[in-house]
């Protein structure tokens, strides 16, 4: 009975990946002006938080100056983060289905990078936006971090190398 329930629930493990792809697609659907304003707002929020936590005493002019200066890195870091999360959301279901090692890295990487490339193509159809190979590269770095995180997390959760664990178990039976 338990195996039947697990088999029925396994396909639902892809829902977070589909939701993440939808979110990325919706961000890419924003025109260039909306996207820039959103990035500036987020950068401003980061510097307001830094000022509050570290008690820097920055006035609004200084915060705006820093937000303008760091808007581009904040935007690219957001790209990396969303693709890192996408890679996690894609890798975990593949892991659940039994993919491990290089096969997991390769398939999850191909799926996520292909989505990044298609997302850049989608931006050609949005006002004031354009494709960028550099963005696909930045997205790919996020994908690499996400897949590495899943592989390390699952390896640690399973207690390291499964071959050594199986050998250890056999010794106790003799």
Question: Which ranges hold each PLM region?
Answer:
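Membrane-interfacial, low-structure loops and terminal tails that flank and connect transmembrane helices
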Residues: 2-5, 158-174
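Membrane-helix interface segments
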Residues: 11, 99-106, 129-133
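Hydrophobic alpha-helical transmembrane segments
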Residues: 14, 105-110, 136-137
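Small-polar-interrupted transmembrane alpha-helices in polytopic inner-membrane proteins
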Residues: 19-24, 104-124
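Membrane-interface loop-to-helix entry segments
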Residues: 72-88, 133-141
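Interfacial helix-loop-helix junctions of multi-pass membrane proteins
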Residues: 116-138
